[in-house]
Design a protein with these regions (language model features):
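Conserved alpha/beta enzyme-core scaffold
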Residues: 15-16, 21-469
Length: 469
């Protein structure tokens, strides 16, 4: 009965195209049903000591994860890689001592961060553009499990929001299991945006559960202040890369309400901020010097409306992160404007965007790639943004601009720092000396901490007596 229903469903999707493709479509249906199995049966291929891939965000294979966790007592030393998975992850939950499963992430979600904090997961440092290179040359991958869209009439499944890294992982895995969820938006573009049924070993039906929707945090007053400071730096026809969070969303809304026109998109992560710009008629991609007329993305996370916007939209196309995040590719977009956030910066211009001390908060992602690409772009600019302070659990306020880091992981080195922004202003560190950098960074620090930072700069011999106090 399951096989009959599946054939009927795909035949309905194919509609009259079955006539056009003749036996090939029926061949795909036959192959589909020959590979269709339960999650419990599919994960039987995993052996002790294997490396298993969970890919990224909405590509997380929830049914296979649950089925694999139930094999805990049969397995030892299975190592799993994932990325930005919003949890819970059952192979972590079922094995607190990590005797059977060891989970590793490329980029921490809130859930993965908590697991790392508890010593129940580990971080794997990398820049996203190198991921394909890692898999082709250095990494072992035994089993890839990934959630995909329903199969189309040509035998393809689409990776949708997780397309940026899924194909290279699947291509370099010995066994590929796909979980079909027809809620996954079909984001088209390069060949790496999809996988053919002939490349798949097992197919698991999920019942098409609703997709996780990224909450849109309301921008804070500080977010809005920073966004207002950045808006004048964006010109008509600029190609914009936005990160995720309150400030980028605030900037997207400001752009939507502005007089800007003909903006383009080339971004690692596409989210609802771009949808707001599109709905306001600001995002046309008409002036792009690379992929003219098309917005380019590597990963997507957003609302239901956002997913509907991207589905089968020929004007917004997906490419692997090895391409999207390549600084040379980024630089081919004239007037590239890259806007990302950080956790803190020091007086030398070093930027920490992924850790607090040695505690992993997120990941390197593509920030460094876009900073480099924007610098190489004709008319390009790269902005790293932060609030000037943060408040700890005890209610004590701390400056995000510090004299120098001690233990924090550096995401963007001082030699590549460009524009840095807080609610107190925007400074350009490109080409500045250490004393000029100290002066610039102190000028955008919270006023309550400026005297303290001046004393630290003097102690570190990066402060001129003639600098303004």
């Amino acid at each position: 009965m399951q096989t009959f229903l599946q054939v009927a469903h795909i035949d309905k999707i194919c509609d009259n195209k079955c006539i056009k493709f003749g036996r090939s479509v029926m061949g795909f249906l036959s192959e589909y049903n020959s590979k269709l199995t339960s999650a419990e049966a599919a994960v039987k291929c995993v052996k002790s000591g294997d490396w298993v891939e969970y890919t990224s965000n909405l590509g997380f294979p929830a049914a296979c994860d649950l089925a694999l966790s139930k094999r805990r007592d049969e397995l030892k030393g299975v190592k799993i890689r994932g990325d930005l998975i919003f949890g819970p992850i059952q192979v972590i939950e079922c094995d607190p001592d990590m005797e059977h499963f060891v989970y590793n992430t490329w980029h921490c979600s809130g859930y993965e961060r908590k697991m790392c904090d508890r010593g129940r997961a580990f971080f794997e440092p990398m820049v996203f553009r190198n991921l394909a290179w890692y898999y082709k040359n250095f990494l072992t991958s035994d089993v890839c499990m990934v959630t995909v869209s329903g199969m189309d009439d040509e035998g393809y499944f689409y990776f949708g929001p997780s397309l940026g890294m899924s194909k290279c992982i699947a291509d370099n895995s010995k066994i590929v299991i796909v979980e079909v969820n027809r809620s996954i938006p079909r984001i088209k573009g390069s060949e790496e945006a999809r996988i053919h049924i002939s490349e798949v070993d097992y197919i698991v039906e999920t019942g098409d559960p609703p997709l996780f929707e990224m909450p849109n945090p309301a921008p804070t007053e500080t977010d809005v202040k920073i966004a207002n400071l950045l808006l004048p730096y964006i010109k008509d026809g600029a190609c914009v890369q936005l990160g995720i969070g309150g400030m980028p969303n605030a900037l997207g809304e400001l752009i939507a309400d502005s007089d800007l026109k003909d903006l383009g998109m080339h971004t690692e992560l596409c989210s609802d901020g771009y949808l707001a710009m599109f709905k306001a008629g600001k995002l046309t991609n008409a002036k792009k010097t690379l992929h003219n007329g098309k917005g380019v993305l590597g990963i997507a996370i957003g609302s239901h409306e956002f997913n509907e916007w991207l589905t089968d939209n020929p004007a917004y196309v997906g490419y692997p992160l090895s391409y999207v995040n390549d600084p040379y590719v980024i630089s081919q977009n004239d007037n590239m404007v890259s806007i990302n956030a950080c956790i803190g910066a020091d007086l030398y211009g070093q930027i920490s965007s992924e850790s607090s001390g040695t505690r992993q908060i997120s990941g390197t992602g593509g920030q460094l790639d876009f900073v480099c690409g924007a610098q190489m772009s004709n008319g390009g600019k790269a902005f790293i943004c932060m609030s000037s302070t943060h408040t700890d659990k005890s209610g004590v306020m701390h400056s995000r601009i510090v004299p120098t880091f001690s233990g924090d992981i550096i995401t963007t080195p001082r030699s590549l720092a460009f524009y840095i922004a807080t609610e107190y202003g925007v400074v350009n560190l490109a080409g500045l000396t250490t004393w000029e950098r100290a002066d610039a960074m102190i000028s955008i620090a919270h006023p309550d901490f400026r005297d303290e930072l001046i004393k630290a700069a003097e102690a570190n011999r990066i402060w001129l007596p003639s600098n303004k106090r």
